[in-house]
A protein has these predicted regions:
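Residue-level detection of the helix-turn-helix DNA-binding "recognition helix"
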Residues: 12, 26, 37, 65
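Short, basic-rich loop-to-helix N-cap that marks the start of a DNA-contacting helix
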Residues: 38-51
Length: 71
């Protein structure tokens, strides 16, 4: 699973709010909602975030293996 917990930390460090992403960079509330819920986000959106925040993908996203269950 890809999680975006680091995104919110990086945004805070860079002084970028969700409101600013919506107002100045035309992010939709749906895009932000998917990020909050660790949902599907396309690579274009991730690229935009890296450009806006001047950061690497590892500063906004992290891969965490799904827990395997025995069937």
């Amino acid at each position: 699973m890809i999680v975006y917990d680091k995104l919110w930390v990086t945004m805070k460090e860079k002084g970028i709010t969700q409101y600013k992403l919506m107002k100045d960079y035309h992010f939709s509330s749906g895009q932000l909602d998917r990020l909050r819920k660790n949902g599907n986000v396309n690579t274009y959106t991730l690229n935009q975030l890296c450009e806006i925040l001047n950061c690497d993908i590892s500063d906004i996203a992290e891969y965490i293996p799904d827990k395997k269950t025995d069937a």
